[in-house]
């Protein structure tokens, strides 16, 4: 096996940086601009660029592993072809890197943001997020937002509470990724700091209406790609589950975007590239933006609010409240046989335990659960039944 000497790795790293500076757009984020909260000598050695290290750290995190059993839209359904969150983040990464390549942006940073953007999502998707947010709010720790939790998890919970020491640009892109908000144009707000990151996280916890803008073009691309990745995929899943028919799609949107996931993704990506190339912003054309907005409205009414996927929400909400109260009580009474100790706190550092109140600890534990792990913690006679479709 050939072993590289440190000198060879140094030369390789210099060559990669030189190539990056020559090939990327003047408004791309160079790897040399990456800023960590704590100086990290280990990430500066070897041949990997700084944002590539971030992507690797996220990919090898325990939280990333749990994507495999977290709901995207449809839960309590046995169907091997329905999208789960692990596939969603891969689709976001692929679509965003494709756009970024044609815009001359940093694909390593795009990949890191994409892979980490949903780390903080609860079990049972946005319904679970809403239930946990109500519990957090009533227990005095602010609203729960999965984008805020994603940053918190990667920065303060992973690695026994030490976090992964990711770059500011990566964490900012994750925080500002909100794909549910419709934007025709996104232009980055540059020159942010870790102090501003903390302020934006706090503001978002206290006010759901706060709108955040990424600090990099790469972050803006991921935010647009988030929507591109799910809009057609959710339609295909809903058709597969016989909740809608392809002929139900709004004609105005179909005329511009097509009626299959493949054509929708292709047309949206092409439009973004055409309208963003060599610009300081990322944008859709007005026509495509309007068609996408109509399609999002259709998905909301016919898929996300469909009674067929909402029939267990009352029970799941009750189970969230039951577990939240149980774990609070277990911490207060120091019930060390409880899973919140054996499955979580026993693996966390003293710094994490001392710097988080019991309500925040319970929030972090529940938010990190997969769908099946959550259900296994509930009384067997209260667990909703899985459907085979």
What are these regions (language model features)?
Residues 116-124, 229:
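Short active-site segment of divalent metal-dependent hydrolases/proteases
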Residues 110-115, 223:
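Short alpha-helical catalytic segment bearing the HExxH-like zincin motif
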Residues 115-119, 136, 178:
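Acidic, glycine-rich active-site loops and adjacent beta-strand->loop/helix elements
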Residues 1-86, 91-99, 106-107, 128, ...:
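Histidine-centered, transition-metal-coordinating active-site segments
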Residues 125-138:
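A glycine- and small-aliphatic-rich helix-loop capping segment at beta-alpha/alpha-beta transitions
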């Amino acid at each position: 096996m050939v072993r590289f000497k440190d000198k060879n790795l140094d030369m390789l790293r210099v060559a990669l940086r030189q190539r990056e500076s020559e090939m990327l757009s003047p408004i791309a984020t160079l790897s040399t601009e990456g800023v960590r909260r704590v100086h990290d000598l280990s990430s500066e050695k070897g041949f990997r660029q700084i944002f590539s290290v971030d992507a690797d750290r996220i990919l090898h995190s325990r939280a990333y592993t749990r994507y495999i059993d977290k709901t995207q839209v449809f839960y309590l359904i046995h169907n091997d072809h329905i999208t789960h969150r692990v596939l969603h983040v891969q689709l976001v990464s692929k679509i965003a890197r494709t756009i970024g390549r044609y815009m001359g942006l940093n694909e390593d940073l795009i990949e890191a943001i994409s892979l980490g953007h949903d780390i903080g999502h609860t079990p049972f998707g946005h319904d679970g997020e809403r239930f946990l947010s109500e519990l957090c709010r009533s227990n005095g720790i602010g609203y729960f937002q999965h984008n805020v939790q994603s940053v918190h998890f990667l920065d303060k919970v992973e690695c026994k509470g030490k976090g992964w020491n990711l770059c500011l640009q990566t964490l900012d892109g994750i925080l500002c990724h909100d794909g549910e908000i419709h934007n025709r144009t996104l232009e980055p707000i540059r020159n942010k700091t870790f102090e501003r990151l903390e302020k934006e996280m706090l503001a978002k916890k206290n006010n759901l209406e706060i709108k955040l803008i990424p600090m990099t073009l790469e972050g803006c691309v991921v935010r647009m790609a988030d929507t591109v990745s799910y809009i057609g995929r959710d339609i295909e899943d809903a058709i597969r589950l016989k909740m809608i028919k392809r002929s139900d799609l709004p004609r105005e949107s179909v005329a511009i975007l097509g009626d299959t996931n493949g054509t929708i993704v292709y047309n949206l990506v092409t439009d973004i590239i055409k309208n963003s190339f060599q610009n300081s912003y990322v944008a859709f054309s007005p026509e495509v933006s309007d068609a996408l907005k109509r399609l999002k409205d259709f998905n909301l009414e016919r898929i996300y609010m469909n009674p067929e996927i909402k029939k267990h929400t009352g029970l799941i909400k009750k189970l969230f409240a039951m577990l939240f109260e149980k774990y609070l009580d277990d911490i207060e009474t120091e019930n060390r046989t409880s899973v919140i100790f054996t499955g979580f706190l026993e693996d966390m550092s003293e710094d994490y335990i001392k710097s988080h109140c019991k309500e925040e600890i319970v929030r972090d534990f529940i938010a990190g659960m997969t769908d099946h792990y959550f259900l296994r913690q509930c009384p067997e006679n209260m667990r909703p039944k899985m459907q085979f479709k």
